[in-house]
Amino acid sequence: IGFGRLTVRALVGLGCAAVLGWMALAIYYSPLQPAWLRAGLSALVPVGAAVALLLVRPLRWVLAGILGAFLVVLAAWLAIPPSNQRDWQPEVAVLPYADLHGDSITVHNVRNFAYRSETDFTPAYYAKTFDLRKLDRVDLIAVYWMGPAVAHVFLSFGFAGGDHLAVSIETRKEKGEGYSTLKGFFKQYELFYVVADERDVIR
């Protein structure tokens, strides 16, 4: 086998492994019930592919089967809807909204918690009207975690007179729910637009 053909086969093999891995995880973290069925179908992905590689010829039929299965799982994954009806953690329980009237915007449910610690706080919200003609600055703020290589960034809009309004896109977690980066790749969390007093998000 020439070097070029060997390289192509290696790339195809790596691509298939990546696709199979994604499919297995997408099924495992899907909302499919019961849980044992989800786990079984997830395990069936690599096992079925291995059996097909051993028994099915020509190999292009195996590749076609993997592609077909991938498209089915991808379509199901894309169809998973977000939900607004869950028992949310208090930090992300109240949705903000706004009314726009000409050059004025009234923002409701601006978060302004009184924090005693990261987990001990008193929820508080207010509504405020901003004159968009007085918007004079936009700050990009980075909050670093896991060292200097990873940061959460958000925007703070500054208005003449000293008013600031921060907007941060965050994970909307349920009560008792932790965070997993891996699960985050598979639609396990809704997203939430935190609209807050700048002092709420910069502490």
Residue ranges and their predicted role:
Residues 3, 7-10, 40, 68, ...:
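Alpha-helical hydrophobic membrane-insertion segments
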Residues 3-6, 53-64:
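Membrane-helix interface "capping/anchor" motifs
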Residues 8-52:
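Membrane-embedded alpha-helical segments of integral membrane proteins
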Residues 59-82:
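Internal/C-terminal transmembrane anchor helices
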Residues 65-67, 91-94, 110-126:
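Juxtamembrane/interfacial segments around transmembrane helices
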Residues 82-101:
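Alpha-helical transmembrane signal-anchor/signal-peptide segments
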Residues 103-104, 110:
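Juxtamembrane extramembrane loops of integral membrane proteins
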